[in-house]
Each structure stands twice: as C-alpha cells, then as structure tokens.
Amino acid sequence: MSSILPFTPPVVKRLLGWKKSAGGSGGAGGGEQNGQEEKWCEKAVKSLVKKLKKTGRLDELEKAITTQNCNTKCVTIPSTCSEIWGLSTPNTIDQWDTTGLYSFSEQTRSLDGRLQVSHRKGLPHVIYCRLWRWPDLHSHHELKAIENCEYAFNLKEDEVCVNPYHYQRVETPVLPPVLVPRHTEILTELPPLDDYTHSIPENTNFPAGIEPQSNYIPETPPPGYISEDGETSDQQLNQSMDTGSPAELSPTTLSPVNHSLDLQPVTYSEPAFWCSIAYYELNQRVGETFHASQPSLTVDGFTDPSNSERFCLGLLSNVNRNATVEMTRRHIGRGVRLYYIGGEVFAECLSDSAIFVQSPNCNQRYGWHPATVCKIPPGCNLKIFNNQEFAALLAQSVNQGFEAVYQLTRMCTIRMSFVKGWGAEYRRQTVTSTPCWIELHLNGPLQWLDKVLTQMGSPSVRCSSMS
C-alpha cells in the first residue's frame, strides 16, 4: 500500500489489508484524495490498536475481521473517547468531508461542552464498520447491533463495542400491499385539501415533556442530539388503530371487512428519487426543484455543490430578494442533513441556527395538531416521516372512502424553515412569511396514493401538496 507510513506495525498492516475500498476514484484529484484517505485510515487503525493492546482485546478484533464471524466477542473501547472520536455534532460551520466525518482545522468545543482536538469526528462503531465492512455507510441510523452484543452503541455503556461484525445494516422493511375495493362511482372533482399554508400553527420544542413509549431500547444518537427513534404508543398514533406496531400489520388485518367487494392489492414501490425539494423566499418560489436520489443529502447555504448529495441554496438568485432574506441566507450555513434510511426520514440540524419543521406524520405520532411546527435546535435530529406508520394510516383510510385517502396527501409534504420560525408563538404566523424555507415532497408515498386513488375510481389527477 503506497500510503503506508514508516514504522507501521505488522498488526496494523494486516488489519489495513482487510479494509473495504469504496468504488471509483472520485474524479479529478481522486488519487490525492484517496492517498489522504488511506493515511487517515492508517491513523485510525493505529489509534485503535494502541487502545486495544492495553486491554488485551486486539486478538479478538483481528479474529473477527479475518474470520468475518459475528459470533466473536465484543471489542470495546471507552465510550468517553470524545477527544478523538467526538460524540456530538459540532456547533461550528466546518466542512463535512468525503467520508462522512466532520473535519476541523482547529480545536472546537462540542455541544456537550467537551473539547475536540482531532481533525475528524465520528462515532467509533460507524468509523470501523465503514472501514472494514461498508465504505458507503453514512450514519449511525443505518446500523443496528446484533442481539448478543453486550456493549452495543445504543446501550450507552461506559464501553462501546467497535467489532464491525457485531453490527448489521438496517434493512428497509417491506410494506404490505393495501387491498383496495374498486368503486363504480367516479368523482368529477377532488375534495378540498387543507395544506395548512394559511392557518396559524401551534409551536413546540421537541421533546418538551414528550416521552415516546417503546417496547425496546431505541438506538438513540449520542449526547447533544434530540432523538425519538422507536415506535410510539398506539394511543399517540391513533385511538382507533389496532394494537401493535405498523410492522406487525398485514394485508389481512388492514383490509376491508366486506370481502364480497372486488379487492385489488396496491403495492408500494421505491421511486428513483425519494424526495423532491423546492426552495422559497417568502411566498416566491426560487430556483429549480432538487430531486434526491441519494439516501443522505444536505441543504445548505453555500455555493459549491460538489455532488448529488448537496442542494446549495447560496447559488440561487432572486431579483426580488430583500435585506431580511439576505441576512437570513447568511445564517443558513451548513443547513440541514436529510436521511432516508430503513423507510424512515430524519432531519438533522447542522446549522448554528435552529430549523423549524412542519411534519403532519411526526405530529400525529406525538398527538400534536397536524399543523404544529417543531423547533429543532443545532446539533439535534428528528424523525420526520415513517413509511410503516403511513402504510397503516393508508390501509385504514381506504375503509373510510376516497376523501379520507385523499386527505393523506398532506402527510407526504414536509415544510422546513431556516433560522426564522413561524406559528402562533412567532411574529411570522405562516410559512410564506418566513424568509427562507423549503418544501419536501415524498415521492414514494405520493405515488402510492396516486395508485390507490386510481384504483378507487378517482380522477386521473396526480397527488401533490398543491392539489
């Protein structure tokens, strides 16, 4: 390996020999970038080897990697190694590097008050799973520990297991098809749809006294995050829903009781672009729609879109832009990171300023009014959509008729403002009064609704937030 530094211990060379390589060279300058990456990987392995030599767990790590066996023992390091790995999102505007790790040019202090002294930050189990198993790993949301891991990240022990074969990739659950009766009555026009644009929504600071009930320990993010991973109680979701999580619902339990109807299964399929994002300044649409194909993307205020994972608002011009909008745009900074993993959508605030989210799906989970706007502080993340919850609501709404299904259209649209919030507690009471905001259209659920409505005998009108 050309990047190996002098005096590299043999065990480090052996472990680096098992490193998984990402496909492609990264285009122009890829050779230099790959060289820097290999040097960093060597440093990461050296640091881990140094820690494990002190505890006698080095042999177990090498055994796990060479045999690729999940039945090996836990390989642990102290979970308080924040001075090297970092356990929270930084509150400074720095570059997110090509490996998905935070890069720092100098010492910075994280949200939990600890001093960061390394040039990159990341969760240790994510770093080593990326190094030895999945080079395309983006986030801890994509990982879950195996059952026999005693020091899994989500258990929040004093030690954390970094055995890459003690973690699995989260798989996207298969949604059961919705059984839809074919109705003979054809509607000539769509019913009115309240998309909350002109209403004055309530406000909340998540989690503000809300404690989601769960039957298992959620894989929560590290300190400095707000998280609500895990399912909530059925009472919070909907008083009339059957007991059990959406994952346990089947086409039989979700289908209409009258089996004499002509029932047709309507299945969910993943689109090429999981969401489309439109940017607005006040009530004016600015720029073209961004179509997201990658499971992780950022919407930021910068001007250098390096790849398909960035929507840079700094590039967009608007002749009608006023001073308030200009000032707000300067504070967007690193903006928001959106993840689509395992049928769930997460929003993580990377900016120094809060973001404000209106997600009817999230609001229903917590028993809030559908139009409630939730403030997400810097360094925090929130689950803003869950495909399984939506599938359960869709199957239930089919029994209630066309209009009930059509009203679910608004659940597939998420609005998000930067820096400035809106609602009853703010001077700006509607989203179109905020200087900078975006609207996400979740294409998979919207296309599913299209197919269900068509099967029910609806007019051939595509679902959108503006329908």
UniProtKB/Swiss-Prot annotation:
UniProt lists compositionally biased (Polar residues) regions at: 207-217, 233-243
Placement of sequence motif PY-motif: 221-225
Q: Which Gene3D superfamilies match?
A: 2.60.200.10, SMAD MH1 domain
As stated in the Swiss-Prot or TrEMBL entry, residues carrying the post-translational modification Phosphothreonine are: 8, 220
Q: Which residues form the MH2 domain?
A: 274-467
**Sites of N6-acetyllysine modification:** 19
GO biological-process terms attached to the record: activin receptor signaling pathway; anterior/posterior pattern specification; cell fate commitment; intracellular signal transduction; mesoderm formation; odontoblast differentiation; paraxial mesoderm morphogenesis; positive regulation of DNA-templated transcription
- Where are the N-acetylserine residues found in this chain? 2
Q: Enumerate the UniProt keywords alphabetically.
A: Acetylation, Cytoplasm, DNA-binding, Metal-binding, Nucleus, Phosphoprotein, Transcription, Transcription regulation, Ubl conjugation, Zinc
Domain MH1: residue ranges: 10-176
Q: Which SUPFAM superfamilies match?
A: SMAD MH1 domain, SMAD/FHA domain
Record-stated family:
Belongs to the dwarfin/SMAD family.
The protein's job, in short, is:
Receptor-regulated SMAD (R-SMAD) that is an intracellular signal transducer and transcriptional modulator activated by TGF-beta (transforming growth factor) and activin type 1 receptor kinases. Binds the TRE element in the promoter region of many genes that are regulated by TGF-beta and, on formation of the SMAD2/SMAD4 complex, activates transcription. Promotes TGFB1-mediated transcription of odontoblastic differentiation genes in dental papilla cells. Positively regulates PDPK1 kinase activity by stimulating its dissociation from the 14-3-3 protein YWHAQ which acts as a negative regulator.
**Stored PANTHER family:** MOTHERS AGAINST DECAPENTAPLEGIC HOMOLOG 2, SMAD
- Subunit info? Monomer; in the absence of TGF-beta. Heterodimer; in the presence of TGF-beta. Forms a heterodimer with co-SMAD, SMAD4, in the nucleus to form the transactivation complex SMAD2/SMAD4. Found in a complex with SMAD3 and TRIM33 upon addition of TGF-beta. Identified in a complex that contains at least ZNF451, SMAD2, SMAD3 and SMAD4. Interacts (via the MH2 domain) with ZFYVE9; may form trimers with the SMAD4 co-SMAD. Interacts with TAZ/WWRT1. Interacts with FOXH1. Interacts with SNW1. Interacts with CREB-binding protein (CBP) and EP300. Interacts with SNON. Interacts with ALK4/ACVR1B.
Q: What is this protein called?
A: Mothers against decapentaplegic homolog 2
In its UniProt entry, the species of origin is given as Pongo abelii (Sumatran orangutan)
Q: Which gene encodes it?
A: SMAD2
